[in-house]
Amino acid sequence: MAAVTEHTETLHEQPLFWRSAQGADPPVLYLHGVPTSSADWVPFLERTGGLAPDLPGFGRTGKRGDNDYTMAGYDRFVEAFLDHLEIERVRLVAHDWGVVGLLWAQRFPERVERLVLVNAVPLLPGYRWHPVARLWRMPAVGEVAMGFATRAALRRTLPQPLFDDAWRHFDQGTQRAILRLYRSSPEDALARAGLDLGAIECPAMVVWGDSDRYIHSRFAEAYADALGGQAELLHLPDAGHWPWYDRPDVIDRITAFLVD
């Protein structure tokens, strides 16, 4: 397995943290979701190599109050991160809110060689936010709800291997980023954000833990239908929102697709 290296540099006058490992060319770009960090992707980096940044507001990347914690802001971050490292093409893997990478991919489909979506927030018509997200989207109520995000509550939510890192970085800056992201993302905006998914014509794989309490498995088919190229579907009935922790064997399935 490849050794995973941690990096901290400065981008836009604030810390930028990412993990990397030697591997495939073009590299795999792994984008994490809420409320975790690039730590999600260590088992993949060890197998495929690649890059996994902490998105702004999460992990060890900057959490300034004046950051743009919107879909458009994260889209610009992905572009800036790749430009900073002078990377032209990638194999893209996105989980949950890592789906912001699809905004970048729709603008630059020629820069994406392969695509894997794993229980990704639907940039599609018909999605309705889950109950916790609806609370977060409400002014004042969301702040109160964050107050109930205790150590015990987060432990019940996350796969055990991710808990320590997520809790260590689940500070006021991360909570602010989460609230701003959800509040700037009404359901109709999600659907509009995916209007050009058909422009992404590279080979794709859509992986779904069907026991996800946040996103219904029907959106796996919806994503496969919306993408412009051939998309392989993999449903995992016995897995949840982070399916590779419930079914570690899926890591090898995704790895084989990425490096084929």
Where are these regions (language model features)?
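A short loop-to-beta-strand scaffold at the N-terminal edge of the catalytic core in hydrolase folds
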Residues: 12-20
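Conserved HGGG/HGGXW glycine-rich cap/lid loop of the alpha/beta-hydrolase fold
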Residues: 20-60
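Short N-terminal helix/helix-N-cap motif within the alpha/beta-hydrolase-1
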Residues: 38-43, 60-63, 102, 125-126, ...
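Active-site loop/oxyanion-hole signature of alpha/beta-hydrolase fold enzymes
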Residues: 52-93, 97
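Flexible "cap/lid" loop of the alpha/beta hydrolase fold
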Residues: 106, 114-143
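Conserved alpha/beta-hydrolase catalytic His-Asp/Glu region
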Residues: 126, 146-198
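Conserved serine/cysteine hydrolase catalytic core
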Residues: 174-225, 235
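Catalytic histidine-centered segment of alpha/beta-hydrolase-like enzymes
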Residues: 239-248
